[in-house]
Amino acid sequence: MQYFPIFVDTKELNCLVVGAGEVAARKVELLLKTSATITVVAPWACDTVQRLADEGQVTLHTRGYESSDLTAKQLVFVATDDSQLNIDIHHQAKAQNILVNVVDNTPLCQFITPSIVDRSPIIIAMSSGGVAPVLLRYLRQKLESVIPQKVSLLGQFSEKFRETVKARFNSVTKRRYFWEDILDGDVAEQVLQGNNSKAEQMMQDKLALDEHDSGKGEVYLVGAGPGDPDLLTFRALRLMQKADVVVYDRLVSKEILELVRRDAEKIYVGKARSLHTVPQDEINALLADLALKGNRVVRLKGGDPFIFGRGGEEIETLVEKGVSFQVVPGITAASGAASYAGIPLTHRDHAKSVVFATGHLRDNSINLNWPMLAQPEQTTVFYMGLTGLPVICEKLIQHGLPDTTEIALVQSATTTEQKVVAGNLANIQQKVAEAGIKPPALIIVGSVVSLREKLNWFGADA
């Protein structure tokens, strides 16, 4: 992050704008939305700047720039067509620790003006760091279209009751829960419809309740999907942004964690092959204890929590402890990996059934019903099977599958790090070694793998 986004109090801010053409005028008009004092210096002024000066909204000096113009200024915009003058002002301002922006010249900018969605008192500011202005305009248009203009009324309503709510609830957590319920319920709807008197009465009624928060939290068992953040469900994202605490494992990507509420506590309990960071029974107890302390806890798991995610064990403990919970399904790794590798798990000409199995190696063996797994016209998917690949291939051949049976391994499915290696039961181990495949990787066995060459749409083979 080269540019750190901040919001500056403009009540006593003195701003200098050098230049008074159309470009400078746009900066002046933007500054006029604030409480800043604005001085403009230029040999001439366009009609807009001249009108604003005549109306007394800005101070205009119709002359050339002088170094003394920087005196007592905290912010400077430079918008002239004299490149040397722009450079000189940049260096002079920087030497005096005055923030300076030379319009459309990023190397000479100590700060940049963001793209703004204004719903005062709610302000959304975005920036591309000057590298993608067209994309930024596109995103702003999207936000403008989905955020109601009347959101500003909600901001004003919240400001009116802020101190009352603060006095009513003695903890930050209880206040946040209260406001989340208000903004997600009927009170907010009344405000957006312009029914302020009704909204205020409803607000007073809610504040008068004996106890808004029971003091008992809840656990949300959330499937984070196979890796790509775009594959999260809406509900998963909504709960992630409500959480007080997030308990996550190794398969949850950094990009997905970035979507969690910024000030939520994050607890890593990740498990890797041969290394269990936190025993499962301790994780189960941790979830219950956190919720019983009044927290909203998101248990974030890669894939789907009920498919080799041990979600059932975790909620059994919650039931025993009397903790409320919700389960949010996620796209399981098998579905994500197969889709992004161009391998349909079922196909009328290849597979009439699909079986999910764990390939986890224990004591150099995998205890599975191999005759059932080694069936023709079937797709078998092995989770956590990379280390056990030699055993899987040996057992499938031993129980009747030809060594020419197609097999594929998909590493880091649905992400930019995805790799796919395809082969057959006889040669796949060598191919995997040559490609340097690492966990997390999924194994797909069956003739559907032969369709990859035709159906692949996401990336190339490793």
Swiss-Prot record:
- Chain sites annotated for binding NAD(+): E22, V23, P43, W44
Does this UniProt record's set of keywords contain Lyase? Answer: yes
* Active site per UniProt: D249 (proton acceptor), K271 (proton donor)
What EC number(s) does the entry state? 2.1.1.107, 1.3.1.76, 4.99.1.4
What superkingdom does the record give? Bacteria
Region feature Uroporphyrinogen-III C-methyltransferase, mapped onto this chain = 217-462
Q: Modified residue Phosphoserine is at which positions?
A: S128
Q: Where is this region: Precorrin-2 dehydrogenase /sirohydrochlorin ferrochelatase?
A: 1-203
Under InterPro entries, the record lists: 4pyrrol_Mease, 4pyrrol_Methylase_sf, 4pyrrole_Mease_sub1, 4pyrrole_Mease_sub2, CobA/CysG_C, NAD(P)-bd_dom_sf, Siro_Cobalamin_biosynth, Sirohaem_synt_dimer_dom_sf
What reaction does this catalyse? Answer: uroporphyrinogen III + 2 S-adenosyl-L-methionine = precorrin-2 + 2 S-adenosyl-L-homocysteine + H(+); precorrin-2 + NAD(+) = sirohydrochlorin + NADH + 2 H(+); siroheme + 2 H(+) = sirohydrochlorin + Fe(2+)
BP GO terms, sorted: cobalamin biosynthetic process; methylation; siroheme biosynthetic process
A GO molecular function term, named singly, is: NAD binding
Residues annotated to bind S-adenosyl-L-methionine: P226, G302, G303, D304, I307, T332, A333, M384, A413
- What single Pfam family name could you report for this chain, choosing any that match? TP_methylase
The function of this protein is: Then it catalyzes the NAD-dependent ring dehydrogenation of precorrin-2 to yield sirohydrochlorin. Finally, it catalyzes the ferrochelation of sirohydrochlorin to yield siroheme.
PANTHER family reported for this sequence: SIROHEME SYNTHASE (PTHR45790:SF1), SIROHEME SYNTHASE-RELATED (PTHR45790)
Entry's family note: In the N-terminal section; belongs to the precorrin-2 dehydrogenase / sirohydrochlorin ferrochelatase family. In the C-terminal section; belongs to the precorrin methyltransferase family.
Per its record, how is this protein called by name? Answer: Siroheme synthase
- Species name: Pseudoalteromonas atlantica (strain T6c / ATCC BAA-1087)
Q: List the taxonomic lineage.
A: Bacteria, Pseudomonadati, Pseudomonadota, Gammaproteobacteria, Alteromonadales
